[in-house]
């Protein structure tokens, strides 16, 4: 299955706020939920919604998510926490969390168009797995800096997670350590995703 390119707001109304997909948020008393979601929720439906929430937030295909679940299952620690750490340490997500891009699809495009350097090397793979002490910068040209500058200016510096630091003047970010569960930017029960 290919990446989802359809209307984003429909997904947000159905699954709740997904900050990685778009900045828009649904109204609290949405009539759509009353129309379609009546009665008792089945266990399968709950698990499917959690999986879809994770998929659409990080912009993954079904196959990519299954691959991450498989890798997390081989780890000796909790599968759900390892899964979230793998997803949060992706380059496109790190750019989004640093504020260098307003959404994950925008961060993905920055990486694909070769505007981003990791440890002074161009990386054009959005799923590149960052490690602690990785330095993420923009290219030296004016166009790259302008794209990132607009996003940094509109981002909230108070939302920066503890495992990341950013120097807004040099357009440089640093991954200090691996992410803790409490700093994940999405309200999700990762165990339901693993069980699905």
UniProtKB/Swiss-Prot annotation:
Function: One of the primary rRNA binding proteins, it binds directly to 16S rRNA where it nucleates assembly of the body of the 30S subunit. With S5 and S12 plays an important role in translational accuracy.
Protein's gene: rps4
UniProt keyword annotation of Transmembrane helix present: no
Keyword hit for Ion transport: no
Keywords linked to the UniProt accession: Chloroplast, Plastid, Ribonucleoprotein, Ribosomal protein, RNA-binding, rRNA-binding
Cell compartments where the protein resides: Plastid, Chloroplast
GO biological process: ribosomal small subunit biogenesis; translation
The family this protein is said to belong to: Belongs to the universal ribosomal protein uS4 family.
Oligomer and partners: Part of the 30S ribosomal subunit. Contacts protein S5. The interaction surface between S4 and S5 is involved in control of translational fidelity.
Protein name: Small ribosomal subunit protein uS4c
A Pfam family that the UniProt record links to this protein: Ribosomal_S4
Gene Ontology MF terms in the entry: rRNA binding; structural constituent of ribosome
CDD domains: S4 (cd00165)
Superkingdom as given in the UniProt entry: Eukaryota
Any one cellular-component term (Gene Ontology): small ribosomal subunit
Primary localization class, coarse: plastid
S4 RNA-binding domain mapped to chain residues: 89-152
Disulfide-bond pairs as recorded: none
Region of interest (Disordered), residue spans: 20-39
InterPro entries for this protein: Ribosomal_uS4, Ribosomal_uS4_bac-type, Ribosomal_uS4_CS, Ribosomal_uS4_N, S4_RNA-bd, S4_RNA-bd_sf
């Amino acid at each position: 299955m290919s990446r989802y390119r359809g209307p984003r707001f429909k997904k947000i109304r159905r699954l709740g706020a997904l900050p990685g997909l778009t900045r828009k948020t649904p109204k609290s008393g949405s009539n759509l939920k009353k129309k379609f979601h009546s009665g008792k929720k089945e266990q399968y439906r709950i698990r499917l919604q959690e999986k879809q929430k994770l998929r659409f937030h990080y912009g993954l295909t079904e196959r990519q998510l299954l691959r991450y679940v498989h890798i997390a299952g081989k780890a000796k620690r909790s599968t759900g926490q390892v899964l979230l750490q793998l997803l949060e340490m992706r380059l496109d997500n790190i750019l989004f969390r640093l504020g260098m891009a307003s959404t994950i699809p925008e961060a993905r495009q920055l990486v694909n168009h070769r505007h981003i350097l990791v440890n002074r090397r161009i990386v054009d793979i959005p799923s590149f797995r960052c490690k602690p002490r990785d330095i993420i910068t923009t290219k030296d040209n004016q166009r790259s800096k302008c794209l990132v500058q607009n996003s940094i200016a509109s981002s909230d510096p108070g939302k920066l997670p503890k495992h990341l630091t950013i120097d807004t003047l040099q357009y440089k970010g640093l991954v200090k350590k691996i992410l803790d569960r409490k700093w994940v930017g999405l309200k999700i029960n990762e165990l339901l995703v693993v069980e699905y």
